[in-house]
Amino acid sequence: MTKKNLAVCSFCGRSEKDVEKLIAGPSVYICDYCIKLCSGILDKTPAPATQEIATSSTSSPTSLRVLTPKEIKRHIDSYVIGQERAKKTISVAVYNHYKRIRALMQDKQVSYGKSNVLLLGPTGSGKTLIAKTLAKILDVPFTIADATTLTEAGYVGEDVENIVLRLLQAADYDVARAERGIIYIDEIDKIGRTTANVSITRDVSGEGVQQALLKIIEGTVANIPPKGGRKHPNQEYIRVNTENILFIVGGAFVNLDKIIAKRLGRTTIGFSEETDLAVTNRDHLLAKVETEDLIAFGMIPEFIGRFNCVVNCEELTLDELVEILTEPANAIVKQYTELFEEENVKLIFEKEALYAIAQKAKQAKTGARALGMILENLLRDLMFEIPSDPTVEAIRIEEDTITQNKPPVIIQKSPEAIA
């Protein structure tokens, strides 16, 4: 495209390639530099120089604090039980992302490649929780998106570039900060092709979405509508370069273990049974995943090729589910205990009851996600009655409460305490 075909600012003459935003009006354009200049004049304050505007939203190299992999993992450990290999992989990838940003800010001649991460594993194993925990500790903008809501351009649904808009919003519309952020996309396996053969019809939610995501993952200058939605002529856009954004994607990839077993020449007999041996075999197979297995599942080679780190989250054991109930900083048992303490009532869980809850969650086959529902159903009636009953001192949850549906043990206050 020749320069005369590029839109240019009607005031300073800069082309759309030289500015972050170029706002269009009827036969006229104005760039972000001129807007800031005019704003300074209107406020009767000196307008910043062009170079200062270009760098004002970019932190200096020394201001970017780089957490070590051990520091990152220690923060994740406070909320996520198990998944040691996945947590180490994520910690190293994020650490290298920080170093890459700092190298770019220092204009080093040697540039580091992105280590985009693909997390695979069963529902409720902690993939999304790892991502949400990262959002709490990182000094870069972070956003989470759901791949199942995405469609390729021209179809009803969410445009892929809206993911970048969310990151921009997380950065308070600071383009420079957004361009060094991290995006987590959940349920990525749901956009796999349903067949290995290329369809002659349009694939609205599969390969087409992978192709659209591929563009922003490998790096492009995306024109983002500030308020989201579909693009239309004469609309204002914000230009965001996605080249240095780190992408982490996760998915359950159901039956991927069988594809791996077929490649390795192993049998999967008994894998449908949720025995400890079957789970161990499945986790062992997922640890041996190769690019060809993911392609056979329905992911396109170009998409998978953008993820240097592929790591599986193992199915949670019974002991790990019990730990999730009680150990993390925001453990669900701690949450309910505090809720009852506000009513001056002690909530006591016997050890056997905790294991019974964990076993019930394991049978639900949704991992840690089932724990909250089980406790909510268990304690709902008590939370309704207790605020109106000043005679209750404590509630004890026993194993039979879970396995036999017996009511919890209610311990009454002494008459003197009530008086």
From Swiss-Prot:
Q: Name one GO cellular component term.
A: HslUV protease complex
- Which positions in this protein are listed as binding ATP? P122, T123, G124, S125, G126, K127, T128, L129
The ClpX-type ZB domain is annotated at 1-50
Q: Which residues bind Zn(2+)?
A: C9, C12, C31, C34
- Known CDD domains for this protein? RecA-like_ClpX (cd19497)
UniProt GO MF annotations: ATP binding; ATP hydrolysis activity; ATP-dependent protein folding chaperone; protein dimerization activity; unfolded protein binding; zinc ion binding
Q: What keywords does the record list, in alphabetical order?
A: ATP-binding, Chaperone, Metal-binding, Nucleotide-binding, Zinc
InterPro entries for the chain: AAA+_ATPase, ATP-dep_Clp_protease_ClpX, ATPase_AAA_core, Clp_ATPase_C, Clp_protease_ATP-bd_su_ClpX, ClpX_bact, P-loop_NTPase, Znf_CppX_C4
| Listed GO biological process terms | cell division; proteolysis involved in protein catabolic process
What Gene3D superfamilies does the record point to? 1.10.8.60, ClpX chaperone, C4-type zinc finger domain, P-loop containing nucleotide triphosphate hydrolases
Protein family per UniProt: Belongs to the ClpX chaperone family.
PANTHER family in alphabetical order: ATP-DEPENDENT CLP PROTEASE ATP-BINDING SUBUNIT CLPX-LIKE, MITOCHONDRIAL, ATP-DEPENDENT CLP PROTEASE ATP-BINDING SUBUNIT CLPX-LIKE, MITOCHONDRIAL-RELATED
Its biological function?
ATP-dependent specificity component of the Clp protease. It directs the protease to specific substrates. Can perform chaperone functions in the absence of ClpP.
Q: Which HAMAP family match?
A: ClpX
Q: How does it assemble?
A: Component of the ClpX-ClpP complex. Forms a hexameric ring that, in the presence of ATP, binds to fourteen ClpP subunits assembled into a disk-like structure with a central cavity, resembling the structure of eukaryotic proteasomes.
The molecule here is called ATP-dependent Clp protease ATP-binding subunit ClpX
**Taxonomic lineage of the native organism:** Bacteria, Pseudomonadati, Chlamydiota, Chlamydiia, Chlamydiales
